[in-house]
Design a protein with these regions (language model features):
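Flavin-dependent oxidoreductase catalytic cores
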Residues: 1-307
């Protein structure tokens, strides 16, 4: 084995005290195996049985916390009615002694399936855009508070289902749209006035989840967050060569990361970043992912997950 890969096989201790035997992770992948009510099926169970010994952490594909958050017809939904089916998933994921993580999200503005079935797709603002192909309904403050509670209830269900942790998906969908300069046009405490107000929903959801975890989960329960470091919107009326309109910048994300690191989280997951437009904004074209993740690592090194 090449020496540079040796560290991947070494144990690592998370901030919550849990030691993982290696540093391999199965990243979240949506396999579209759920039934039409969001319940896992044997397709999901068998998928995880085949991969149960591949990594120390196994993370499910995106799992909705609301019927109004479904982005596809066979997406996982962590609802009361699906709890027993999720217990089969965790049993399969943990069958070789590794840790099972559920990635939780709300589809928000991208919840096309919810729009088709229930008549509404929700976002921070009503927006005249050619990206979606269907109208957005602006969330009221009361609805936002309900969504925060739904994340908390889904956290309870994740604990009861036997998951060892949760990854909060802040990289796209509802939370991303509130953090976005493009999608968020609100003028209230959840609005676009400042980075603090654009970050408010992410932090409120995280705080609700932490409250439940502290009250109900084992001390070594894992809590991670997934970010999209930087993003630009390219609509049909834009040329990709112009770089698109800013959704959020790396500096924006670093601000939100630091706010989240004031809370008891165990890791930060940086996904592939931006779209075609993001690459046009680089001062130096090259190994883009290494440049961006390297910057993020400098900000978090020793504070969350000592990679």
């Amino acid at each position: 084995m090449q020496e540079k890969f040796q560290s991947l096989y070494e144990p690592i201790k998370l901030p919550n005290g849990l030691e993982l035997p290696n540093r391999f992770v199965v990243a979240p992948m949506s396999i579209e195996g759920a039934d039409k009510n969001g319940a896992p099926t044997m397709e999901d169970v068998n998928f995880w049985k085949r991969r149960a010994d591949t990594a120390a952490l196994l993370i499910t594909g995106e799992t909705s916390i609301s019927l109004y958050g479904m982005t596809s017809e066979h997406q996982l939904g962590l609802f009361d009615s699906n709890l027993d089916a999720f217990k089969k998933i965790t049993a399969a994921m943990k069958s070789k002694g590794n840790k099972a993580i559920v990635q939780m999200f709300h589809g928000g503005f991208k919840a096309q399936t919810s729009y088709e079935k229930l008549g509404s797709a929700y976002g921070p603002s009503v927006l005249d855009t050619d990206i979606l192909g269907y109208p957005l309904t602006e969330l009221t403050d009361e609805q936002i508070q309900l969504i925060i509670k739904q994340f908390g209830h889904a956290t309870e269900l994740a604990i009861e289902a036997g998951f060892d942790g949760i990854e909060l998906s802040a990289n796209f969908y509802l939370l991303y749209s509130f953090f976005s300069r493009y999608y968020n046009k609100r003028q209230d405490k959840w609005g676009a006035a400042s980075l603090a107000t654009r970050s408010a929903l992410d932090l409120a959801v995280l705080d609700e989840m932490i409250k439940i975890i502290k009250a109900e989960a084992p001390k070594d329960f894992i809590l991670g967050v997934r970010f999209r470091p930087e993003d630009y919107v390219v609509t049909r009326n834009m040329s990709k060569s112009d770089g698109g309109e800013v959704n959020h910048t790396l500096d924006d994300t670093i601000y939100l990361m630091h706010e989240m690191m004031k809370r008891p989280i165990d890791y930060i997951h940086s996904m592939g970043w931006g779209g075609a437009g993001a690459y046009k904004k680089l001062e130096k074209i090259g190994d883009q992912h290494r440049q961006v993740t390297g910057t993020m690592k400098k900000e978090i090194d020793g504070k969350v997950f000592n990679c």
